Amino acid sequence: MGTVLSLSPSYRKATLFEDGAATVGHYTAVQNSKNAKDKNLKRHSIISVLPWKRIVAVSAKKKNSKKAQPNSSYQSNIAHLNNENLKKSLSCANLSTFAQPPPAQPPAPPASQLSGSQTGVSSSVKKAPHPAITSAGTPKRVIVQASTSELLRCLGEFLCRRCYRLKHLSPTDPVLWLRSVDRSLLLQGWQDQGFITPANVVFLYMLCRDVISSEVGSDHELQAVLLTCLYLSYSYMGNEISYPLKPFLVESCKEAFWDRCLSVINLMSSKMLQINADPHYFTQVFSDLKNESGQEDKKRLLLGLDR
C-alpha cells in the first residue's frame, strides 16, 4: 500500500546538536558580514567627508592667494616706482651739484705787494665797505610821548600865536573852554569817561590848524570856531553816536553853527580819514603839536635878545 519513512528522534536531535556549532558560526558570520558592511559604509562616509574638507581648505587657500597676489604685485610696483624715483632724484641732485661749481676765489696778491715795507711799494688792495643792512625804503620809527596837559598847553600857545590880534588872550583860555565842555558832558551823563586825551587833542589840533584864521577879531569868535571843531572831534572820535549841541553853542543862531560844521567837513574830510588810517601822518601831526611850545620859547628868546 505504501511505505512509511520513520526517523528516530535521537538521530534528529543528534544532527541538530551536531549542526548547532555550524549554525551559530553561520549566524555570527552573517552578523560579522553585516557589521563589516556597516563599517565599510561608515568608513566610506568618513573618507568622503575628509576629502571634502580638504578640498574646501585648498580652495580657500587658493582664493586667499589670488587675493593676496594683486596686493603683493601692487606693493611690489610701488616699491619699484619708489626706487626709480629715488634713483632719479639722486641723479638730479648729482647733476645740480655738478652744474654749480664752487665760486672761484680771487688770486692771492703776490709777495711783493704783501711785503710793501721791504720793497717800498704800498699795497693796492683795499677792502670794500660793507653795505648798510637797513633799507632806505622803510621809514624810521619815531616815538613821541606827551601828556594831555602838555598837549593842551601847546594848543593854547598855538592859538595865541595864530590869533595875534587878540592881545588879551592867554594860552589857558582855550584850555578852559575845552575842559568846561568835557566836564558838562560828563555831569549830564552823555559820556562815561573824559574825551580830552592826547590822541583827541592831536585830532583837534589838526582841525584848528587849517580852520582857524589869523584874522579872528574877538575871543567870542575864536571860542565859537574852536567849539565847532571840538564838536566835530566828538562826532568823529567819540564813543557815543550823538552829542547835544548846547554845550558847544556860544551863540543863539544854530544855522551859523551848522554852516561852520559843513565848511569844516568839506575842507578837512580827507585829512580826518588820513589821520586814522596812516599812523605816520598821526605821528607827524603829534610832533608838530609838541613843537608848538618850542616855537614860543624861541620867540621869547629872540625878544629878550632884541631888548
UniProtKB/Swiss-Prot annotation:
Query: Sorted alphabetically, which Gene3D superfamilies does this protein's record hold?
Result: Cyclin-like (1.10.472.10)
Organism domain of life:
Eukaryota
Using the record's annotations, give every residue carrying the modification Phosphoserine: S8
| Description of post-translational modifications | The p35 form is proteolytically cleaved by calpain, giving rise to the p25 form. P35 has a 5 to 10 fold shorter half-life compared to p25. The conversion results in deregulation of the CDK5 kinase: p25/CDK5 kinase displays an increased and altered tau phosphorylation in comparison to the p35/CDK5 kinase in vivo. Myristoylated. A proper myristoylation signal is essential for the proper distribution of p35.
Q: Name one GO molecular function term.
A: cyclin-dependent protein serine/threonine kinase activator activity
**Ranges annotated as biased composition (Polar residues):** 112-125
Q: Name one GO cellular component term.
A: perinuclear region of cytoplasm
- The chain residues annotated with the modification Phosphothreonine are T138
The record's InterPro entries line, in alphabetical order, gives:
CDK5_activator (IPR004944), Cyclin-like_sf (IPR036915)
Biological processes, Gene Ontology terms: axon extension; axon guidance; axonal fasciculation; brain development; cerebellum development; cerebral cortex radially oriented cell migration; embryo development ending in birth or egg hatching; ephrin receptor signaling pathway
User: Which residue windows does the record flag with biased composition (Pro residues)?
Assistant: 100-110
List, alphabetically, the Pfam families matched: CDK5_activator
Q: Keywords on this record?
A: Biological rhythms, Cell membrane, Cell projection, Cytoplasm, Lipoprotein, Membrane, Myristate, Nucleus, Phosphoprotein, Ubl conjugation
- Disulfide linkages recorded for this protein, renumbered to the chain, are none
Q: What does this protein do?
A: p35 is a neuron specific activator of CDK5. The complex p35/CDK5 is required for neurite outgrowth and cortical lamination. Involved in dendritic spine morphogenesis by mediating the EFNA1-EPHA4 signaling. Activator of TPKII. The complex p35/CDK5 participates in the regulation of the circadian clock by modulating the function of CLOCK protein: phosphorylates CLOCK at 'Thr-451' and 'Thr-461' and regulates the transcriptional activity of the CLOCK-BMAL1 heterodimer in association with altered stability and subcellular distribution.
Subunit organization: Heterodimer composed of a catalytic subunit CDK5 and a regulatory subunit CDK5R1 (p25) and macromolecular complex composed of at least CDK5, CDK5R1 (p35) and CDK5RAP1 or CDK5RAP2 or CDK5RAP3. Only the heterodimer shows kinase activity. Interacts with EPHA4 and NGEF; may mediate the activation of NGEF by EPHA4. Interacts with RASGRF2. The complex p35/CDK5 interacts with CLOCK.
Q: What is this protein called?
A: Cyclin-dependent kinase 5 activator 1
Which organism is this entry from? Rattus norvegicus
